[in-house]
Amino acid sequence: MLNSHNRTEERSTEDIILEPYTYLISQPGKDIRAKLISAFDLWLHVPKDVLCVINKIIGMLHNASLMIDDVQDDSDLRRGVPVAHHIYGVPQTINTANYVIFLALQEVMKLNIPSMMQVCTEELINLHRGQGIELYWRDSLTCPTEEEYIDMVNNKTSGLLRLAVRLMQAASESDIDYTPLVNIIGIHFQVRDDYMNLQSTSYTNNKGFCEDLTEGKFSFPIIHAIRKDPSNRQLLNIISQKPTSIEVKKYALEVIRKAGSFEYVREFLRQKEAESLKEIKRLGGNPLLEKYIETIRVEATND
């Protein structure tokens, strides 16, 4: 029978260091960013070998950021299975995530396009600024304004997609700047995610029931509900408790519904969809992006 020392020797150091990351990517995500990269390539015509590397870089950065997010949010589930740090511990998970970020930067350097490193640095700074202010709001129980929240989303959620498109632009002969469209799509993506977290059965199966409430997160519908009636502190108090009780979360959903926040969010999303389609048309049309917008529309529910 092999002892633990021998088993370690049979695996490479690289495999050991990457194990939390390998665990995460073994559970496939929605891969929306890869689909969007393909869609933007209809315009940018990036050389296939370079596009393959950009896809790899964005995938690495995305999954590394999820591992860190799950630690910072004290999450239980990711893609329907236990989060990496519940299997491998916080120290190893953080080290692995940081390691993967630097491996991704190494891939950028291999492409030997000087402007790409500057783009990566700028967007990784944006990502950490967005994450930092969101953590501050949660931990200090400070409810941001909608404008502050959208600014955070532009840094955090739009940042990775913007990084992908800016890397593609650096490798493309096109001189058209597509980042304004990317920002609209990124905002729509995050606000839709906030809505679905509180309303979708599939999100419950993958991340848990109304996980944003348990995380104490000021998401877009929660911000609207709190600011609609500042004198009613019930929702703010519930958020501060980071509830795990299903009944408490159901009550919070009722408070949000009565504030008209779900309908408000749906209207906001419809506006962003219209803005996206208008910008796509201005840029010459793109059937893949138009199809993407069509498939992510949020239909009205009975609330």
From Swiss-Prot:
Residues that bind isopentenyl diphosphate: 30, 33, 62, 79
SUPFAM superfamilies referenced in this protein's UniProt entry, alphabetically: Terpenoid synthases
Cofactor: Mg(2+)
CC cofactor note: Binds 2 Mg(2+) ions per subunit.
Descriptive protein name: Geranylgeranyl pyrophosphate synthase
One MF annotation (Gene Ontology) recorded for this entry: (2E,6E)-farnesyl diphosphate synthase activity
Pathway entry: Isoprenoid biosynthesis; farnesyl diphosphate biosynthesis; farnesyl diphosphate from geranyl diphosphate and isopentenyl diphosphate: step 1/1; Isoprenoid biosynthesis; geranyl diphosphate biosynthesis; geranyl diphosphate from dimethylallyl diphosphate and isopentenyl diphosphate: step 1/1; Isoprenoid biosynthesis; geranylgeranyl diphosphate biosynthesis; geranylgeranyl diphosphate from farnesyl diphosphate and isopentenyl diphosphate: step 1/1
Entry binding sites for dimethylallyl diphosphate: 78, 156-157, 190, 207, 217
Binding positions for Mg(2+) 2 per the UniProt entry: 69, 73
